Amino acid sequence: MSMSVDTTIEGETGTEISADEARVIDVVERLIADHDPGSTPERAFLEAQYDAGLAWVHFPEGEGGLGVSPKLQRTVLQRIGSAGGPMGGMKNPIGYGMCGPAVQVHGTPAQKELLRPLFSNEQIWCQLFSEPGAGSDVASLATRAELDGDEWIVNGQKVWTTLAQFASYGLLIARTDPELPKHRGITAFIVDMHAPGVDTRPLRQMTGEAEFNEVYFTDVRIPDTMRVDEEGRGWAVSITTLMNERVS
């Protein structure tokens, strides 16, 4: 993804700010002027924020961003927060911080259309990587996906999945070629969490709350159009996702 070449200009207080920051501030001010945070419904405001390129400012224009440094997202949050606006991603932290960036890098144009409802909290996302027998070695997964025509049939189990019980979609990795070395035989998919065969079971804590879940897949059919990147590129998708966990 390309970013603009930045220069510095003088800000309102006489201090120097970058041209990119000045641009971001201008876009934020126009967003707030056109969509009063005090009267605009939260989802409508967040959709307008996405359309303005202020969802993930480092994403390309037209995909929720402006093509500027990700550090400028702080400027967006501060100014929208000061105006009483909603904080995009707060209700959807896994989707916003990890799944969205992975789909932006590896997804198809059709898959990237899911970023807008993800950001507006219309659709919650979860990450389906960890398995009971794999421990911290994500690549040692046993969940299988087998191609059947233009669909993949998935069987297996994931665990410690945050917010899966509320999710519309999940970013799933599964083994598609058991003959290859473990890091190479993995493929990533976007799975409909309400598809037949998906069984989400909350893991109750002593407090009665259930932030984490087990998710079982029994002959779940995923269209090949929901495969993320090429077959066998699931580990690359995983690395992108987990690197964003470090900064989300």
Map each language-model feature to its residues.
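A structural signal for short hydrophobic beta-strand segments in well-ordered beta-sheet cores
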Residues: T143-E146
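Glycine-rich beta->alpha junctions and the first turn(s) of the following alpha-helix
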Residues: V198-S248
